[in-house]
């Protein structure tokens, strides 16, 4: 039982390290998103789309890391050898890691929502630019018609 407990402690330490690594990676993605919202005002639509794609790749990488940590915690949770005493010990050892992992799921969802909003901003900006171009094109066409004395038909 003691050997099994020591093994569980080692797996719990590894799980904590992997949770911390995933937490740092997710924090960097969140910081990247904070920078994006500031860049949205001054960036062109094509730059915004490129930034969104770059951020999407970072989010997917962080999500894969979180999923890997979840699998690591699941394997560590299963290392109790069928003993109820060890099972309770495993649950206690991994409780904080599981709680942090659940918070990470909501953080990933929040970052994905922020990215979705950023993309919507890019689409609105594109629509506004197209509206300005349409108005300018209509003005040019009417000026040309007036200069050449053409009718609307």
Language model feature labels by segment:
Residues 1-153:
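Extended alpha-helical scaffold segments
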């Amino acid at each position: 039982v003691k050997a099994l407990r020591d093994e569980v402690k080692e797996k719990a330490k590894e799980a904590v390290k992997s949770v911390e690594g995933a937490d740092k990676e997710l924090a960097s993605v969140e910081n990247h998103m904070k920078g994006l919202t500031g860049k949205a005002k001054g960036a062109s639509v094509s730059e915004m789309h490129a930034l969104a794609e770059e951020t999407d790749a970072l989010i997917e990488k962080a999500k894969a890391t979180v999923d890997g940590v979840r699998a690591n915690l699941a394997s560590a949770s299963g290392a109790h050898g069928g003993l109820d005493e060890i099972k309770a010990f495993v649950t206690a050892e991994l409780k904080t890691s599981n709680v942090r992992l659940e918070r990470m799921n909501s953080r990933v969802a929040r970052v994905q929502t922020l990215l979705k909003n950023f993309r919507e901003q890019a689409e609105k900006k594109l629509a506004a630019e197209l509206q300005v171009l349409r108005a300018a094109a209509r003005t040019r066409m009417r000026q040309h018609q007036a200069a050449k004395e053409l009718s609307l038909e």
